[in-house]
Amino acid sequence: MSTGKIIQVIGAVIDVEFSRDNTPKVYDALNVKEANLVLEVQQQIGDGVVRTIAMGSSDGLRRGMVVENTNAPISVPVGHGTLGRIMNVLGEPIDEAGPIQYTETRSIHQAPPAYDELALSTEILETGIKVVDLICPFAKGGKVGLFGGAGVGKTVTMMELINNIAKEHSGYSVFAGVGERTREGNDFYYEMKDSNVLDKVALVYGQMNEPPGNRLRVALSGLTIAEGFRDEKRDVLMFIDNIYRYTLAGTEVSALLGRMPSAVGYQPTLAAEMGALQERITSTKTGSITSVQAVYVPADDLTDPSPATTFSHLDATIVLSRQIAELGIYPAVDPLDSTSRQLDPLVVGHDHYETARAVQKVLQRYKELKDIIAILGMDELSDEDKRTVDRARKIQRFLSQPFHVAEVFTGNPGKFVSLKDTVASFKAIVNGEYDHLPEQAFYMVGSIQEAIEKAKTL
């Protein structure tokens, strides 16, 4: 095992000098035993000097400290021993529940599966959330992005998806907390524990307080564990909250590594880094990885390079809108902005497809009429347009739904609505079967039956 010494420390980026014959390879993990710190090699500068990123805090490091080369990349344990445990980026347990029992470790840097290994699936995963099942259904083995600005409900919507799918789904789940609030990680752990599904979930956390090197790699650590389960012929759910923080960590590190920034100050390697992660989240002939990723949208701008780069990798995009959240409609999903490749008559069936498009058509017409209503009022509209507006407002309210994970805040018990009920209900509203009910009856209910019951009390 070759050793070197630290020659420069600039925040999270540390230069280490080795002898010329023993220069470490890119991505090799280096150990600073004295500071109990792991470094990852990013660049070879020449003359035996390598530039590395610290996986922990670089406080207290000084020049001349001895560094050992492990001659291998960072590796994490895979397999059943990781279930029910909270790990850090290095795969070390941080839940104070003793060491992890494992028989195999894997490097966090893996090549994506070969083309002939890939498998496509069109089997729809039922989420029980009306707006998602109707407008942007997602397939087993698909990739879903939850886009939204600050405070519109990404994490709550994701927690509800985890609650509804992970509990119904008999397979394993991996949750990677990338640069998010430690409190949310804590809440999630106890929620899984209370629902008795903790023994089917592996948790990998690199939260907001961690240095950028850690946040840049923690998504890969979580993904490696998910790949381990997939290669055991299992169907895995992979949850990443938040993919934007992964990009942001890359931006923080990039400038320190001496790269020229590109658009909006992002790293020039943004697309390559995103591709390296996303191409590995895929289903093979042995098993599937279905991923749900929360994507923070800076300043609500979907054209920002980070969310824009993420878009191209996804099968379904669920866009959360601040305008809808302001109306008090939760989940604040924008049914006109959200899309899915699975919304195809050959996949979801003719009835579902026609209903979803009819709902979007009514909402789009309402959006166009809003300006006229604001200037001239409802009275100036034709009878047909008045009917459209009336139905659109009912649809808008019926797209709201009480969540299981939000019961403690709202006092409303959560509702799981089957796909069959969802399609039938919206079809009936669009066809005018419930024109006689007041629009308040449709707000924050599960099935249409509940709306009918609620109307009797109004």
Swiss-Prot record:
Gene Ontology, cellular component aspect: plasma membrane; proton-transporting ATP synthase complex
Topology of the protein relative to the lipid bilayer = Peripheral membrane protein
- UniProtKB keywords: ATP synthesis, ATP-binding, Cell inner membrane, Cell membrane, CF(1), Hydrogen ion transport, Ion transport, Membrane, Nucleotide-binding, Translocase, Transport
Binding positions for ATP? Answer: G148, G149, A150, G151, V152, G153, K154, T155
The protein's enzyme class: translocase
NAD recorded as keyword: no
Q: Which catalysed reactions does the entry list for this protein?
A: ATP + H2O + 4 H(+)(in) = ADP + phosphate + 5 H(+)(out)
A molecular function (GO) held by this record is: proton-transporting ATP synthase activity, rotational mechanism
Q: Name its cellular compartments.
A: Cell inner membrane
Q: Which domain of life is it from?
A: Bacteria
Q: What is its EC number?
A: 7.1.2.2
* PROSITE patterns with a match to the protein in the record: ATPASE_ALPHA_BETA
Signal peptide interval = none
PANTHER family recorded: ATP SYNTHASE (PTHR15184), ATP SYNTHASE SUBUNIT BETA, MITOCHONDRIAL (PTHR15184:SF71)
Record text on subunit structure and interactions: F-type ATPases have 2 components, CF(1) - the catalytic core - and CF(0) - the membrane proton channel. CF(1) has five subunits: alpha(3), beta(3), gamma(1), delta(1), epsilon(1). CF(0) has three main subunits: a(1), b(2) and c(9-12). The alpha and beta chains form an alternating ring which encloses part of the gamma chain. CF(1) is attached to CF(0) by a central stalk formed by the gamma and epsilon chains, while a peripheral stalk is formed by the delta and b chains.
What biological function has been recorded for the protein in this entry?
Produces ATP from ADP in the presence of a proton gradient across the membrane. The catalytic sites are hosted primarily by the beta subunits.
Q: Which family does it belong to?
A: Belongs to the ATPase alpha/beta chains family.
Output this protein's name.
ATP synthase subunit beta
- Species the sequence originates in: Francisella philomiragia subsp. philomiragia (strain ATCC 25017 / CCUG 19701 / FSC 153 / O#319-036)
Print the organism lineage: Bacteria, Pseudomonadati, Pseudomonadota, Gammaproteobacteria, Thiotrichales
Report which gene this protein is encoded by. Answer: atpD
